[in-house]
Amino acid sequence: MNSVRTADVKRTTKETEVEVSVNLDGSGRAKVDTGLPFFDHLLHQFAFHGRIDVEIKARGDLEVDDHHTVEDVGICLGKALNEALGDREGIRRIAWALVPMDEALVECAVDISGRPYFVLKGYRPRRNRIGSPPLSTENVSHFWKSFCDHAGVTMHVVVRWWDNDHHAIEAMFKAVGRALGAAKEIVGDGVPSTKGTLRRG
């Protein structure tokens, strides 16, 4: 079992420069600067509700679009989670959360299985963008898919009810944080799998 569950990931391309640090046994502190204020706010919610300490610094070609920045933050955060989880010994592995935010109600179930898969049901954005510089609402699902692909996590998110895009998306990040926060908790000994491993590949 890993005594310290932390990781640092860097990614540099012609489109972005991203640095991510995570501590899975933190208190939910976050220091985030992506150049997208609403995205920063969402990542703070994820960290706080997951009790994961997170530092994220990203610089991307926002003059083109927010897509590359959002995607690469998802890639790096997923890689960092995957690395910090180590051998997965003793984790709860499977967990879920149901989170209300005013009229919005969002459910998330996760399995730290080593098999990446992402499903989002019940949400079709009404607003194209939120914030300034704006986060494209269509990129929210792309962020979580990128995250799951590199974290080795299966995640199902169901937006049961919503009227306001901000509320639906924020409740989504809170629900994911709470579900992952519970799934990564150490609750026993050994790898919670009949295969004996939860690593990818």
Curated annotation (Swiss-Prot):
EC number: 4.2.1.19
Enzyme kind, highest EC tier: lyase
Top-level taxon in the UniProt lineage: Archaea
Keywords per UniProt: Amino-acid biosynthesis, Cytoplasm, Histidine biosynthesis, Lyase
GO cellular component: cytoplasm
Leader peptide range in chain numbering: none
InterPro entries (UniProt xref): IGPD_sf (IPR038494), ImidazoleglycerolP_deHydtase (IPR000807), ImidazoleglycerP_deHydtase_CS (IPR020565), Ribosomal_Su5_D2-typ_SF (IPR020568)
Subcellular location: Cytoplasm
Gene Ontology process terms (BP): L-histidine biosynthetic process
Catalytic reaction annotation: D-erythro-1-(imidazol-4-yl)glycerol 3-phosphate = 3-(imidazol-4-yl)-2-oxopropyl phosphate + H2O
Principal subcellular localisation of the protein: cytoplasm
Protein's pathway: Amino-acid biosynthesis; L-histidine biosynthesis; L-histidine from 5-phospho-alpha-D-ribose 1-diphosphate: step 6/9
A molecular function (GO) term: imidazoleglycerol-phosphate dehydratase activity
Annotated family: Belongs to the imidazoleglycerol-phosphate dehydratase family.
UniProt name for this protein: Imidazoleglycerol-phosphate dehydratase
Organism: Methanopyrus kandleri (strain AV19 / DSM 6324 / JCM 9639 / NBRC 100938)
